[in-house]
Amino acid sequence: MPMRRRPDLPAAIAVERPAAGAAPVVVSLAHAGRIYPPEILAAARASQPELERLEDGWSDLIASRATEAGATVVQALWARAVADCNRGEGQMAPGEVAPQLRAQFSAPGRKERAGLGVIPTRLADVGPLWKKPLDRAALAWRLESLHRPFHAALTDALEATRARFGHAILVDLHSMPSIPPGQAGHGAQIVVGDRFGDTADPWLVDAVVASAERFGVPVSRNQPYAGGHIVRTHGRPDRGVQAVQIEIDRSLYLRRDRTPDSDRLKPLSNWFYGLLQEISAAWPGAAALPQAAE
């Protein structure tokens, strides 16, 4: 792969800001991208439909009204197969990369060993995703094209929000497969993660959980998803940046063929819109802040 991104390729990142009436909320969508650059498809051993299994399919539609609620939205437009923005740059198993790169990766966790590191390399029932192990040029191209611009855009959005309001709330939105029996959190259809209190104060997590319960679905805290690289990196309650990860069961809005079910998606999108309004107003002292557009 070339080190430099071609100028004819579509944008990898989108930042959408509210047209009127802002709120101290930033929504991140790291896994909703559906663009597969030609370089990625050429390097793939797996088919595009197999690579699409990595996506948080159509989760961006859940956040379709986020800017109406006053939130800024930062979205990866390129697919997760390019790079996983919810992993750190060092999160890879040494065995998943070319020999000359192995020294820079160590102590991999369960997800990395399963091939779900910063560059996804394997999937269950598919096997290796790429024709050859990642070399230095391929890794650099992926990180420089998607991963680093995404986090730079997210940092900028949070800093601008905090500068305007004195604080910021990050909602990192994902979707998940149904949690199987025997796994922690089984039965929950919305999982709220704050890394067990590290990335958000209790009032925010309580507000998100209460809103999800009013929506009428089972909710879990931190089980089985406590929050990944995004909330761990950007959540700094002591500096005025609260961050929660929200995982939503895909069965709530997708058909079995993984296409959106508009009849079920609309109430979910409306719920998320209302949630953003609620947490904007729930911050202690928020009564003195400008209100988001209705």
Where are these regions (language model features)?
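N-terminal catalytic or cofactor-binding beta/alpha core of small enzyme domains
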Residues: 2-170, 175-294
